[in-house]
């Protein structure tokens, strides 16, 4: 049995919002496995999904560079020790120059970057001189570049505070449609920066992930229903528990069965068959929406668009395809947040938490 420390309990509590004893018990039941403890709490309806932001620590900036012809988009992250330096004009210039250098030289790795030449000197030496001038340790943590294929287009967006950057690539069926899609892609990048989808579409979801999230979703809804039954508020009816959580689960057979049920309902209601074709599509869309809640939470195409929350990103793209007269397929997106995935430094809070256990 792994030792369950106060620090572990506090981290789990801050990540999930669950009670302290619930967190301690979850860690005990999962032998100290953080991710399994999160899942256990969620299946019991006691906590929310762990937020990536709860585990961010580093300071620094994310930078984005899009080529003038919209065929190459690069995003990079350079870390500093303090937020003060991250606002330094020289550091800001360093991040922009480095990102442009990466793109202009088609660099593929941090190691390749350090051995490259910039302004006549090795980048490694150039960075050391910047460190000496700025007065803090600086680290090029990561970068990535997306390239447009034939009739493709890329774009990017950097949030005003420089902590979040996004690049995106799309394939189109003509150069004209690709050119018209530039602004759309930038707006979708802004959506990604705000909503942080984890996947492109439901097709990218792992079935085990879907099944685990479905259990957590049902537990959460049942817990809310229990509270609504207790309050007996007529303005807050109970949630309908969905059969499924993602379009990944909606096979052709399941969709066919749902359609047949709708037809039976229409027949029972005495609706004439000649108007069924006008009713069935809307009811099928409602069925899919009710049973794909994970898609709207985790996937870009399934999320409601921040600039028009009555439409999904997928629907917005479909409308633009009609307007532009051609196909637009989002191929890939990359979103960097400063410090994402880095562990926090240990703080002196163990005694405070231990006193409550």
Swiss-Prot record:
InterPro entries: EF-Ts_dimer_sf, Transl_elong_EFTs/EF1B, Transl_elong_EFTs/EF1B_dimer, Transl_elong_Ts_CS, UBA-like_sf. GO terms for cellular component: cytoplasm. The keyword Protein biosynthesis applies. Residues 82-85 are annotated as: Involved in Mg(2+) ion dislocation from EF-Tu. PROSITE patterns: EF_TS_1 (PS01126), EF_TS_2 (PS01127). It is found in: Cytoplasm. Its main location: cytoplasm. Keywords: Cytoplasm, Elongation factor, Protein biosynthesis. GO terms for molecular function: translation elongation factor activity. Associates with the EF-Tu.GDP complex and induces the exchange of GDP to GTP. It remains bound to the aminoacyl-tRNA.EF-Tu.GTP complex up to the GTP hydrolysis stage on the ribosome. HAMAP family: EF_Ts (MF_00050). This is Elongation factor Ts.
